[in-house]
Amino acid sequence: MLAFNPLVTALAALIFLFCQANANPPLMQRLVHEYQWKTKQGLPRQGACTPHNLAVRREWSTLDVETRLEYIEAVKCLARLPSIIDPELAPGARSRFDDFQATHIRHTRTIHATGSFFAWHRHFVYLYEKALREECGYTGYQPYWEWSHWANLPITANPLYDGSNASLSGNGVYIPNRNGTLQLFPIPNPSPDTAIYTPPGTGGGYIYDGPLVDWELHLGPVLYSYDNGQYIPPNPRPDGLGYNPRPLIRDFNNTLLQQGASWDIILNMLVNVTDMHEFHPLFFQGPHLAGHIFISGVDNDIFTSPGDPLFWFHHAQVDRIWTIWQALDLETREYALDGTLTLLNCKNLPFRRILAGELTVCDDSTAQP
C-alpha cells in the first residue's frame, strides 16, 4: 500500500531538475534557465543532494530509443508484478500498476481542486518513478510531456504516442458520428448539468498499435461517461475498486491542448500569475484538464486516470510547471497553498461555470464549514 504525507512540502521538488525540450519559445527557455540556476544555487556543495548529482527528468522526445524501450519494459513489468495493496481496500487490483490507480481512486475527492492537489500528485509521481526504478530496473527518471510544444503538430509527430514500438502506443480506433463525452463531476448530487463535456476526438475506441496494444485495465469506471462511443462495462462496486477487465480507450484531440495548454497560456501563468489562489484554479481548469481530456478514455474519469500510462507523463509536466512557477519566487511560493481538503470547498457548485471562467470561488451558500 502507498503511504502519503498529506501535504508533501514543496522542497521535495528540489531533488529534481527538469531538462527542457528543444525548440521552446525564448521566454520559456529563459524561465527554465532561471529555475535551474536558482535550484542549483539553493543546494549545498557537499552531501547527498548537490548540483552535481541531481536527478533529471527529460521530455520523452529527447530520450534515445534505447532509454524509451527500457522505460516501456519497466511499465510492463509493473503491470506483471502482483498487487500488494490490501485486497479489502481494492479487491479488483491485480498488479503493482493497479496499486497506484487504486490509491488515486481512493483519494480522489481530497486531491483535486483542493489544497493538496499539487503536492499530493508530486509525491505520487515520485513513488511511481521509484517503483519503476527499484522494482523493475529502470535506470532513468519519469519523463514528461511538453504539451505546448506538440499542440499544433500532427498527433503522430509526437514519439510519445505515435503508435511506434518505442512509444506508449497510439490513439484509439476512430469511432465516427459521436456526440462527445459527458463526465459527471464528483460533487454532491452530480447531474449532466454539472458535468464536463469533451467533444469527440480522433479516436474513441480501443488502442490498436504499439507496445501497449494488449494493455488491460482492471479498475473503474467510477464516473460513468455518457455518449462515449465505446461501451464501458460498469464496475461491480460503486467505488470502482472491483475487478473489471477491459482494453484501453483513447480519443486524442489536439484542439483541447491548443485551447488549454498553448504556449501563450503557460507563459502567461508563469509570468503574470503571482498568487497561488489565482494560479491553482487557472492551472487546474486549464492545462491540467486539457492534458487529461486530450487523452480521454480512462482519463475522462477523474478517479481512474492513472490507469493509462500516459497519465504519468502528463502529471510529470504538471509538476514541472508548478516547480518552475515556485522557483521564480521561492520565498513566497515554496509553501503556498490554495484550498482546503474538500473538493472545490463546495457542497454543490456548477463546475461548468468554473470552466467557463464565470466562477473561481464558491458562493457562501455552497462553501463547506
Swiss-Prot record:
Tyrosinase-like protein; part of the gene cluster that mediates the biosynthesis of orsellinic acid, as well as of the cathepsin K inhibitors F9775 A and F9775 B. The non-reducing polyketide synthase orsA produces orsellinic acid by condensing acetyl-CoA with 3 malonyl-CoA units. Further modifications by the decarboxylase orsB and the tyrosinase-like protein orsC lead to the production of F9775 A and F9775 B. The functions of orsD and orsE remain unclear since only orsB and orsC are required to convert orsellinic acid into F9775 A and F9775 B. Residues 1-23 form the signal peptide. Cu cation A binds at H112, H121. It holds the Pfam family Tyrosinase. Gene3D superfamilies: Di-copper center containing domain from catechol oxidase. Induction: Expression is induced by an intimate physical interaction of the fungal mycelia with the bacterium Streptomyces hygroscopicus. Expression is repressed by VeA and MvlA via histone 3 acetylation by the SAGA/ADA complex. Glycans are attached at N165, N179, N253, N272. Keywords: Copper, Glycoprotein, Metal-binding, Monooxygenase, Oxidoreductase, Signal. It comes from the Eukaryota. This is Tyrosinase-like protein orsC. Its EC number is 1.14.-.-. InterPro entries: Di-copper_centre_dom_sf, Tyrosinase/Hemocyanin, Tyrosinase_Cu-bd. Disruption phenotype: Fails to produce F9775 A and B, but accumulates diorcinol and continues to yield orsellinic acid. It is an enzyme of class 1 (oxidoreductase). Pathway: Secondary metabolite biosynthesis. Transmembrane segments: none annotated.
